[in-house]
């Protein structure tokens, strides 16, 4: 999926400014995302792809021996962020139809669990969970366990009963929704991901990120992409 022609034009127009550092706080992009989703800018985090946000979350949240619960198979980076920090990857097999086993995931949460990740739609199987099922799942978890819902492929779901989880995120103090411009907007090579999160989480991510983690052209492209 290529980017919109208007995005290409915006990037080319901005190319003469690549000798200047990017906005380290990504204020314009974060404001554009906040406006899109009806949130405050303080609830928006951006990174050099969603991978970057997951790595930052690992740096901010995980210590040696902490547990992270997620499905198996799912996005391979989840296991990697655990391994690099000495955290324990608690991998719950998918059900026979390749759906998340949410009951087993909830049962796997212990006092050592810091993070639960739900990839929805799941990568690589493509199965998705209705928002109501995710809400019921979150209700079973302690509020001190952070839940990240990875919606990297949300733009590709055509089912009538599909609902994203941004409404759920607004209602729960321990839920983040992570997304990317790589898939639906065709910007994989520029690396832009974003999270809609409680401000405690965005503040924690900001403390551990590099100051210029999203380059100038990527910010221009993402802002323009949101207009289409």
Positions of PLM-derived features:
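Short hydrophobic alpha-helical segments of the AMP-binding
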Residues: 33, 81-82, 141
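Short glycine-rich anion-binding loops that position phosphate/pyrophosphate groups of nucleotides
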Residues: 1, 50-51, 75, 120-124, ...
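Short acidic capping loops at alpha-helix termini that bridge into adjacent secondary structure
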Residues: 40-44, 64-67, 112, 144, ...
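N-terminal small-domain helix-loop-helix segment of the aminotransferase-like
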Residues: 1-51, 56
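PLP-dependent aminotransferase-like
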Residues: 60-118, 132
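PLP-dependent aminotransferase class I/II
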Residues: 4, 10, 25, 174-228
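Active-site pre-lysine segment of PLP-dependent enzymes
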Residues: 102-111, 124-147, 151-187, 200
């Amino acid at each position: 999926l290529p980017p919109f022609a208007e995005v290409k034009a915006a990037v080319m127009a901005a190319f003469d400014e690549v000798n200047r550092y990017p906005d380290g706080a990504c204020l314009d992009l974060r404001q554009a995302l906040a406006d899109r989703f009806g949130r405050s800018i303080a609830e928006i985090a951006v990174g050099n792809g969603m991978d970057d946000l997951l790595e930052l979350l690992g740096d901010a949240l995980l210590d040696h021996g902490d547990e992270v619960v997620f499905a198996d198979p799912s996005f391979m980076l989840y296991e990697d962020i655990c391994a690099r920090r000495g955290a324990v990857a608690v991998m719950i097999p998918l059900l026979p139809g390749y759906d998340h086993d949410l009951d087993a995931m909830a049962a796997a949460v212990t006092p050592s669990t810091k993070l639960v990740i739900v990839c929805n739609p799941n990568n690589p199987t493509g199965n998705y969970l209705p928002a109501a099922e995710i809400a019921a799942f979150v209700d079973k978890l302690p509020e001190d366990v952070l839940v990240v819902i990875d919606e990297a492929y949300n733009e590709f779901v055509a089912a009538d009963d599909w609902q994203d989880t941004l409404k759920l995120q607004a209602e729960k103090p321990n839920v983040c929704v992570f997304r990317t411009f790589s898939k639906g907007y065709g910007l994989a090579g520029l690396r832009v991901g974003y999270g809609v999160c409680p401000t405690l989480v965005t503040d924690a991510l900001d403390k551990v990120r590099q100051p210029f983690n999203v380059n100038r052209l990527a910010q221009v492209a993402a802002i323009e992409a949101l207009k289409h």
